[in-house]
Amino acid sequence: MNKLYEEYDNRIAFLIVYILEAHPTDVWQMQSNIKDKVLFATPKNEEERAFVAGACVRKLGIKLPAVIDEFGNSSEQAYTGWPDRIYLIDTNRRVLYKSKPGPFGFKPEELRTRLDRIVKTASRANLRQ
């Protein structure tokens, strides 16, 4: 995602919404979390969630802007975001692309194809004005 963000940042708005911790140490620990040193128990309040989100962004080297879902998980529920999803949403709030659950369901080339289409359409529209 960092690569796509760097490539399209001046034309597409990117945002990560940190939702429920996918693999907390007290529920379902994954080897990838151990390797990446992303080892956190389930946050018990918004402050803990903010701390974990910030640590994950730093430890994983995420360059995209990030926000945190509220503790009631409204974004996660609205977009079925757990454990990870990639969405492409237009300015009218229509979902143009929804990945399969990640990280195994992520297909960056599918997303790149959609992004290219949007950029081309926007460029043609700007030329007509």
Predicted feature residues:
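Loop/turn elements at helix/coil->beta-strand transitions in domains of secreted/extracellular proteins
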Residues: 9-13, 61-65, 83-84, 91
